[in-house]
């Protein structure tokens, strides 16, 4: 009886430790899509932004992503039409 209780106790402790370890490892590997690019100077001068899209995504979702991409570059959204995203040349004022 004592061995069963000891075994179950060790099993619970080891499973809780592994869950804590995997939780911390997964949180370190998380990357965020809204974070700015590593080298923003490369695409800073681009006016047209080519985002990957699909027809299942829809125009509204594409234009939302277009506006977010312009904002990350410090530009205003000029036009989003027929899956073409255009930002203003001047920065946000």
Swiss-Prot record:
Signal peptide (from-to): 1-19
Protein name according to UniProt: Defensin-like protein 210
Main location: secreted
Compartmental location: Secreted
Family: Belongs to the DEFL family.
Entry's Gene Ontology cellular component terms: extracellular region; filiform apparatus
GO biological process, one term: defense response to fungus
Record-annotated disulphide pairs: 63-80, 66-85, 70-87
Keywords associated with the record: Antimicrobial, Disulfide bond, Fungicide, Plant defense, Secreted, Signal
